[in-house]
């Protein structure tokens, strides 16, 4: 299985699919799956290409979810080999997307192929949901596919997202949930004027100081057994004309919260508004909710992937919910159990992104055993 996974991963990496471009990756996948009897459905939205492929017509529906798009390479001169050449050096496959996530995407596809070849009349349905818009806006990708499926009452029972979840060793971590993410774009109004005549102006930076202190030190919650505490970070701040003798008319502050299930986005909005009113600030605020928190509690999917990892590499993974958001947040809206498992994430988005060839082979075996555990038990 390892050779098949690595070969497909190389084919995908060699296509420079900077988000939201697919560059033919999904066509390669569709042609392979179609030969095995998968039903292929294309769901393009704007400049994003999405693929929904399935084999079988009954429940449970087991979906593999992934993305073909990658982030930009940065300075290619800093790479030890060209970022889209997919070279193998000392047992490591190098290239943009090797770990995030063309390697695990290849492993999921080969695992599905091998299972269907051996079990052409399997029970349930095996599906793949693949998008070219995960790394950028994520507005035309998985969410649109999910909305389309829900509109026609299609279900996903279990979903494996191939994001690189492993931390120090393959299989040491799986993600059984993710925190929510909400961004506030806050504009605090003042009155522009000359710095020598502050009584004729109103400095929004000065007026916002105590508010910012409260905002950044407020304890939203203490987390719970599944999630770490909610955290807030200021990401961007700007005011002024660039001149040293002008009091600015407006202060812009952008902040993001990664929040757990102890609070809701509405509670966050209400509390921030209360803080702003308390400090008598003139403001307007625009909110962007990227995703609500989701959690897959111990059950059949988590048991199946845990058992597959234990059987393949002899370690028991830890289920965690930390880190950023993923497309799992959209699939969870369908009521599916969602778990993320993939290779090490230590080089993702970096120069010289790479993944162990041995680990890719193991990923394929683990995904295959997960299918066996879910469909043959």
Curated annotation (Swiss-Prot):
It comes from the Bacteria. Zn(2+) 2 binds at residues 100, 135, 349. One of its GO terms (biological process) is diaminopimelate biosynthetic process. Its cofactor is Zn(2+). Pfam families: M20_dimer (PF07687), Peptidase_M20 (PF01546). One of its GO terms (cellular component) is cytosol. Pathway: Amino-acid biosynthesis; L-lysine biosynthesis via DAP pathway; LL-2,6-diaminopimelate from (S)-tetrahydrodipicolinate (succinylase route): step 3/3. Its EC number is 3.5.1.18. Competitively inhibited by L,L-DAP, D,L-DAP, 2-carboxyethylphosphonic acid (CEPA) and 5-mercaptopentanoic acid (MSPA). Succinate is a poor inhibitor. It catalyses: N-succinyl-(2S,6S)-2,6-diaminopimelate + H2O = (2S,6S)-2,6-diaminopimelate + succinate. Binds 2 Zn(2+) ion per subunit. The active site is at 69, 134 (proton acceptor). GO terms for molecular function: cobalt ion binding; succinyl-diaminopimelate desuccinylase activity; zinc ion binding. Keywords: Amino-acid biosynthesis, Cobalt, Diaminopimelate biosynthesis, Hydrolase, Lysine biosynthesis, Metal-binding, Zinc. Catalyzes the hydrolysis of N-succinyl-L,L-diaminopimelic acid (SDAP), forming succinate and LL-2,6-diaminopimelate (DAP), an intermediate involved in the bacterial biosynthesis of lysine and meso-diaminopimelic acid, an essential component of bacterial cell walls. It can only hydrolyze L,L-N-succinyl-diaminopimelic acid (L,L-SDAP) and is inactive toward D,L-, L,D-, and D,D-SDAP. PANTHER family: ACETYLORNITHINE DEACETYLASE (PTHR43808), N-ACETYL-L-CITRULLINE DEACETYLASE (PTHR43808:SF31). Homodimer. Belongs to the peptidase M20A family. DapE subfamily. This is Succinyl-diaminopimelate desuccinylase. It comes from Haemophilus influenzae (strain ATCC 51907 / DSM 11121 / KW20 / Rd). The lineage of its organism: Bacteria, Pseudomonadati, Pseudomonadota, Gammaproteobacteria, Pasteurellales.
